[in-house]
Each structure stands twice: as structure tokens, then as C-alpha cells.
């Protein structure tokens, strides 16, 4: 990805603390493996994974630490990718007669506070609709490369674009409608809604990549890196690696094939009108006529 020298976003909040990585120990055995799966799933739902703590002030000051040169460059990269998503979504929203409200991206180390509660790095990257912020521990990129063998800067860009995709869903009311529907459904049925949300965020990440390519910042192999990352965090692949078999009813993010397919669809079309991941008859039935999700291009 040709990112150096590109515009950087003003919406980065660096809240990295002075505590070294390793505050959360993940032990061996199936329990530790399950925690690892939850920790490294992209787009984890903060309402499910964060410790709810309404008494925490998300705006309270946090101690900063001097970042290493490597982290400085990683921060610049994240800032450039975020700026690119800002440009793309501002344009798309304007075409729909809307105003795009830019999210903040919080860099943290080990632990952080958000409007959704307290979280550790084990949660992985996440979006909190309560404060419209994306939260990211840069150490996750090392996990993506080493544990999941999904290397490359565009694999990292995909992670950011996916979380920003959740912000787009939030602004359009999709997340709220889905949450309302999930509250009245069984766990298995609610998981189906969660999968559709995540696949749509993958599609939206692909839409961003479509316009990033038009800007000339993609290099040969970048899309393959993003597809590799999408495949690496498919529910089926993670469960197979952890326990040797898969349980489809427990999926919350979609299979590797589904995640790659929806990202590829967004990338090839660049058209948000093609991102209706809720169009299956079963999902429509679960949502109900009164809880149907708005189209991405609805005004």
C-alpha cells in the first residue's frame, strides 16, 4: 500500500499507557483457546465482550508513554488509513444527501475505557457506538501476522476499514435496528443477525478499498492481503483450529468464504446498494416486518 506521504487524520487519540504488553495472560487448554478466538475476532461486539461499567468516564485522562519508532510508523499508517476512510465515506454520504460524522480512533495498550465499558487488548479491535470510536491495540497487527499468518499492510488496513464499516452502520441506524431485533431472539437466531452485520462491515471495507484503488494507493497483492485477513478470521477456520470441528449455530462473524465473498463484492462494485446482507428470507423473518433494516442508500 502506497501510504507514505498521504494525508493523516486528525481523529486519532493515543491513549497508550506505560504498562507493558502481557497484562492479560492467556493460558493453555481449550479455555485459553476459546478466549483467544474471542480475543482475535475482528469486529467483536462490545455489548457481548466488554465488561459493562456505566460508572467509568470514557473521557478520563490516561497516561501516555513514549512510543517506539516502529509504533510511531504504525500510528502514522493507521492515521493515513483512517483519513482515507474519511474521504471515501464523506463523499459517499454526500452523494446520498447525508453528512458523514467522522469517528475517532483510539490507540491503546493492554487496557482501555470506552462508553461501552472497560476492555482489554484481548477483545481485539472494536467499535463502540456509545462514543462513536474505534479502539485498537497496535499489538493486534502482530497477532494478525504471526498467529493467523495474514501479513501485509493492507491486511491491517482491512481491519481498520471493517471497524469503520461498523461506524457507517451505526450512522445509518443499522446497528440499532439489529440490536433491537437481537434482544427478542434466541441466542442462535441473534447470532444470525450478528453474522449479517459483520458480513456487511466486510462489504463496506471492500467499498472503501474500491475507492482507495481509484486513488492509486493500492499495490499489486494488496487485495490478496485483505482477502487473506478476511479468511483468517472466519468462524469456521477459527473453530476448526481450536477444537477440530465447527458449530455453525454459534457463528457470529461468518465463514471464511462468506467474509471473502462480501469483501470482494464491495471491492468490485464500489456500490453500497449492493451490500444488503440481510436479504435472505430466514433473516427477514427473524427481523420481522417492523424491524426490517434500512437500505444502505436510504435517506
What are these regions (language model features)?
Residues 111-137:
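Catalytic zinc-binding patch centered on the HExxH motif and its immediate surroundings
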Residues 1-67:
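Long amphipathic alpha-helical segments used for membrane anchoring, targeting, substrate engagement
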Residues 164-179, 210-213:
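Catalytic Zn2+-binding segment of zinc metalloproteases
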Residues 23-27, 106, 134-137, 167, ...:
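Structural recognition of the beta-strand scaffold that forms the well-ordered cores
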Residues 140-158, 189-195:
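Short pre-active-site segment immediately N-terminal to the catalytic Zn-binding motif
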Residues 72, 76-100, 189-192, 196-239:
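Short helix/loop segments within enzyme catalytic domains
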Residues 233-299:
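Pan-zinc metallopeptidase signature
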Residues 37, 89, 136, 155-171, ...:
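Active-site recognition of the HExxH zinc-binding catalytic motif
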Amino acid at each position: 500500500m502506497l501510504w507514505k506521504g498521504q494525508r493523516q487524520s486528525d481523529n486519532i487519540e493515543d491513549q497508550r499507557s506505560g504498562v507493558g504488553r502481557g497484562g492479560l495472560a492467556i493460558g493453555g487448554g481449550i479455555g485459553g483457546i476459546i478466549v483467544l478466538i474471542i480475543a482475535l475476532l475482528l469486529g467483536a461486539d462490545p455489548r457481548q465482550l466488554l465488561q459493562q461499567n456505566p460508572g467509568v468516564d470514557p473521557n478520563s485522562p490516561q497516561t501516555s508513554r513514549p512510543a517506539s519508532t516502529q509504533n510511531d510508523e504504525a500510528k502514522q499508517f493507521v492515521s493515513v488509513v483512517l483519513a482515507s476512510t474519511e474521504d471515501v465515506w464523506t463523499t459517499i454520504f454526500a452523494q446520498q444527501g447525508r453528512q458523514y460524522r467522522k469517528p475517532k480512533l483510539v490507540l491503546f495498550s493492554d487496557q482501555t475505557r470506552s462508553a461501552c465499558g472497560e476492555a482489554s487488548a484481548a477483545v481485539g479491535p472494536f467499535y463502540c457506538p456509545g462514543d462513536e470510536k474505534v479502539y485498537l491495540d497496535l499489538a493486534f497487527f502482530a497477532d494478525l501476522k504471526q498467529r493467523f499468518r495474514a501479513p501485509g499492510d493492507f491486511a491491517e488496513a482491512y481491519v481498520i476499514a471493517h471497524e469503520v464499516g461498523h461506524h457507517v452502520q451505526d450512522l445509518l441506524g443499522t446497528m440499532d435496528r439489529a440490536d433491537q431485533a437481537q434482544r427478542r431472539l434466541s441466542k442462535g437466531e441473534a447470532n444470525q443477525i450478528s453474522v449479517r452485520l459483520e458480513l456487511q462491515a466486510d462489504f463496506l471495507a471492500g467499498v472503501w478499498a474500491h475507492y482507495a484503488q481509484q486513488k492509486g494507493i493500492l499495490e499489486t497483492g494488496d487485495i490478496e492481503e485483505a482477502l487473506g485477513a478476511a479468511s483468517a478470521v472466519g468462524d469456521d477456520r477459527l473453530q476448526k483450529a481450536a477444537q477440530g470441528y465447527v458449530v455453525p449455530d454459534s457463528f457470529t462473524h461468518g465463514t471464511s468464504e462468506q467474509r471473502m465473498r462480501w469483501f470482494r463484492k464491495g471491492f468490485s462494485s464500489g456500490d453500497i446498494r449492493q451490500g444488503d446482507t440481510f436479504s435472505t428470507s430466514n433473516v427477514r423473518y427473524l427481523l420481522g416486518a417492523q424491524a426490517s433494516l434500512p437500505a444502505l442508500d436510504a435517506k
